[in-house]
Amino acid sequence: MKVLVTGFEPFNGETINPSFEAIKMLPDEVEGAKIIKAKLPTVFRKSLCELEELISKENPDIVICVGQAAGRSKISIERVAINIDDAEINDNEGNKPKDEKIFVDGENAYFSNLPIKLMVKTIKEHNIPAEISNSAGTYVCNHVFYGLMYLIDKKFKNLKGGFIHVPFSHNQVLEKKNVPSMSLEDITNGLFYAIKGVLSEK
């Protein structure tokens, strides 16, 4: 069993991205499953090309993409990805798509096929705040989530996949006012228990 877990590079002036910093701290194996860790560029299109290459190369059974969500206070297990790019800020190569479909031949939306409620339950059992989210936004996170589910629908039909948003880490909010954050250790543990939840699904 292989689980591919991806995070993103920093963006929008941040020096770190807790999604990848937390992934780096995950063990190399969970419940006997090999954990493959990778960093995606915070760039429309390029992120999806790299994700597809990773899936083709590693042939994982499960893919969990992780991203940073400013303003979130909990580990957010995303339910649905929508077929739209509508950026409020530039990506890391200056792209700022507005009201553009991600794939013209894709569905309007795709749902995660991970056991999202079981993932939330498993995380919360270890006293880490978690929730189901019904919006992954319209930036690169939703772009990658939608692209993953599109690839599962069109190409990698036996693959399980989904997306998790994590809060800022504490050191990112030292100069920000009233912005929620979570320790990198808790973010890492939240991802660990999310993976355990997926692997425990009967």
Curated annotation (Swiss-Prot):
Entry GO MF terms: pyroglutamyl-peptidase activity
Keywords assigned: Cytoplasm, Hydrolase, Protease, Thiol protease
Cell location: Cytoplasm
Catalyzed reactions per annotation: Release of an N-terminal pyroglutamyl group from a polypeptide, the second amino acid generally not being Pro
InterPro entries (UniProt xref): Peptidase_C15, Peptidase_C15-like, Peptidase_C15-like_sf, PGP-I_bact-type, PGPEP1_Cys_AS, PGPEP1_Glu_AS
One GO cellular component, as annotated: cytosol
GO biological process: proteolysis
Catalytic residues as annotated in Swiss-Prot or TrEMBL: E78, C141, H165
Pfam families named among the record's database cross-references: Peptidase_C15
Residue intervals passing through the bilayer: none
EC numbers for this chain: 3.4.19.3
Alphabetized CDD domains for the sequence: Peptidase_C15
Family assignment from sequence similarity: Belongs to the peptidase C15 family.
Known partners and oligomeric status: Homotetramer.
Function according to Swiss-Prot or TrEMBL: Removes 5-oxoproline from various penultimate amino acid residues except L-proline.
The protein's name in its UniProt record: Pyrrolidone-carboxylate peptidase
Organism of origin: Thermosipho melanesiensis (strain DSM 12029 / CIP 104789 / BI429)
Gene this protein is translated from: pcp
